Amino acid sequence: MRTILLTVLILTASSTHAADWSQWRGPNGNNVAAAGNNVPTEWSETQDVIWKAKVLGRGHSSPTVIGDLIVLTSADEQGQQQGVFGFDRRTGDQKWGTVVSKGGFPKTHNKNTHASATACSDGRQIYVTFNHHNKVEAAALDLQGKIVWQQDVGGFVPRQYQYGYAASPTLYKNTLIISGDSDTVAWVKALDTRSGRVVWQQNRPQKLNWSSPIVANVAGKEQLLISGCEQIASYDPATGRPLWSQPCLTMATCGTVVWDNDTVYASGGYPKKETVAVKADGSGQILWTNGTKCYEQSMLIHDGHIYAVDDNGIAWCWHAKTGQEKWKQRLQGPVSASPVLVGDTIYASNERGTTFVFKANPQRFEAIARNQLGTESFATPTVVDNVMYLRVASGQGGGRSETLYAIGN
């Protein structure tokens, strides 16, 4: 992402509609595509690719879809610029590019990037977060890529492991909720989407953690949930007031929790390994645990069963209420991206650019296909209107390049 960001043509994007994929893990925060979507199960460079677009820089954020606009964050690591690209959803043409920050890049893990947090949108504005100069900064852009406001949210200075920042922001009504967990300072805050002003804030345990906050309607109320820091924590998303916290898991998790009517499920991490089901009513009841580690990935819940793909590329299915293992199947690792559910079909990409397609069938593992695009895939795909948007990379070092694919019939 070089100075071309400052000169690309700016066009107008349309407003949001019901089919948008407006934030990390989709409009409902569960990585489940809207009902009725029908995405190809097989593709290649020459099959079922509607278009492909070059993405400047490097990033692991997922595509965000707002009407006819696709948004990606990215970073030029050599030039130390972080910014946002807008693409035409119909053609893949780049419509605009905006630099949000320059300089101050921290050290990061080689599997992380300086643009790993996924953008979110309320249909009026786009919201992004970046880590630089020992802080987390949030910015709001209009749908033409013009910056509306920028706000320093809080410090982020990891000490023990300098692996960078990854938590994606989420929206609740007129607030943008952002978390920053490190072993020197840790917080979760809500910002006014119109001004960037802090509406509420809460301190969190000073521990290394990379999970994203998510708002869920569970156990009869709206709850802001974050895993990691050796707990699952719940807050009132309107005020930030702590509702409950349950000791479990381990210090560091990266995945986002999933939930059903009354239970929250999470997995991680480092240094211990655990997958856990916790009642979301504050009772402290842990329904079940096991020793599986889905560290980078978030899980799926569908028809009373949990589906997951762990770091090593093993797919799992558990009964949600009992934790009973229904099956496990080795695919191929390593895996960082999270699986996405389309109807009763799961799509799971590994770090080598292979996407495995299999049924969400609790009775047995039912493989459908495996597809290859590029040589690297860390970003979780998104699905809107029968099209899957997949961010992949090819090459290494100075020859590495990223591509955004639109896959559909």
Q: Across the structure, where does each feature detected by a protein language model lie?
A:
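N-terminal signal peptide c-region/cleavage motif recognized by signal peptidases
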Residues: 13-15
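Hydrophobic alpha-helical targeting segments used for export or membrane insertion
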Residues: 6-10
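Noncatalytic, solvent-exposed loop/strand surfaces
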Residues: 17-409
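Positively charged n-region of N-terminal signal peptides that target proteins for export
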Residues: 1-5
